[in-house]
Amino acid sequence: MFSKPLQTIYTVSRLNREIRALLEQGFASLVLTGEISNFITPASGHWYFSLKDDKAQIKAAMWRGNNRNQSYRPINGAQVTVKARVSLYEPRGDYQLIVEHMEPAGEGQFKQEFDALKMRLAAEGLFSSVYKKPLPQNINRIGVITSATGAAIKDILTVLKRRAPQLEVIIYPAMVQGKDAHLQLIKQIELANIRSEVDVLILGRGGGSLEDLWCFNHEQLARAIFNSQLPIVSAVGHEIDTTISDYVADVRAATPSAAAELVSPNTQELHNKVTQLVNRLANAFKHDMSEKRAQALQLQHRLNLCHPRNQLNQKAQRLDELSIALQQAMRNSLYQQERTLNNLTPRLMRQSPDKKLTQASHQLAQLQTRLNQAIQQQLQQANNSLALQASRLDSVSPLNVLARGYSITKTDKQKVVKSVADVKVGDTLITELVDGTLHSQVLS
């Protein structure tokens, strides 16, 4: 029976290998649905499980390289849809599925509906940034549309109490899951707009499956969000969850807690910022006052140097010096005359001529008179010169010039304006009058 020369003899390994090749070629890619059972995850990171329906089951494996990119983690009893190829585990001869992608059953239909609605609303412009309303600068009252007993409202209130306990919160309770949940959400958005009692709305809930979050993908809700006069922050699910509400809302927050942080100022940060600004303003004021005080002292010093009183004081000092010198010269002259007289007296006494004595006495009296006249003349000339200099100084005094109706015009850099060429349109001018200053601007 086994001696026919054309009969091929297989080994078990060869048979399993060729069956494997046939299976992988014939069923290279297929999509099927079933229930997960016997799900295990060994240390290797691969997933091993069975996929079954009410009449049959098949073993399946999903390698770590594929399952680590999955956002969905299956559990026993879950209905799933998988994309896989058929293969054979050669050592045992078991045929199995090699799964490349997995999602909850029905999620594929949800995704198709989601993508179709997203494209249509985007084409209408509902997601455009042109229509996004900015959050108010000063928020005093916040409205929250969510379940009154869910985790989302607890997270929001916790964050607001920590960051800005002074803010008021108004809760608009609504279902956030189920067939008619979107209708309640729409009703509360419209109610908040009618009451107009809050500055901003937070629309959200905690995480969940795609089916749990589906009410936030409803077209009617998207249009209600778009038509809202109040700015809306969408905070649905976790950071990896994205809904139509997120796209159409004015602002999207990754989580309800993140939404609370977006709409609430950090009181301590604001206090620190105000303190810094006040300190900077005070320092700038002190610095400016110090500079102005130094400038005023410099101007006062310059005015003192130019004041006519100082000029008069200098001339008076010079007059005193001349008077002292003249008196000294007079004393010296008298001293010399006395010496001469003293020298002549013995000679006269020796000659004893009365006539010469009388003449000498007369000459002496004349000389004394002339000397006194010369002294008075010198003093009168000095006084006249001093008066003349004082009059000249007084006539050219800046204060007297200003008193006659004249003025001095300077730029804001204290440069005296002598010609129209010294200024240009827009310059600030300072005009000094006898009783104050005027500030003006060059117009033409």
Curated annotation (Swiss-Prot):
Catalytic activity: Exonucleolytic cleavage in either 5'- to 3'- or 3'- to 5'-direction to yield nucleoside 5'-phosphates
InterPro entries: Exonuc_VII_L, Exonuc_VII_lsu_C, OB-fold_nuc-bd_dom
Broad class of the protein's primary localization: cytoplasm
Any one GO biological process: DNA catabolic process
Superkingdom of source: Bacteria
Protein name stated in the entry: Exodeoxyribonuclease 7 large subunit
NCBIfam families, A to Z: xseA
Function: Bidirectionally degrades single-stranded DNA into large acid-insoluble oligonucleotides, which are then degraded further into small acid-soluble oligonucleotides.
UniProt entry tagged with the keyword Membrane: no
Annotated localization: Cytoplasm
Pfam families to which the protein is assigned, alphabetical: Exonuc_VII_L, tRNA_anti_2
Organism: Pseudoalteromonas translucida (strain TAC 125)
Record EC number: 3.1.11.6
Subunit-structure text: Heterooligomer composed of large and small subunits.
Family: Belongs to the XseA family.
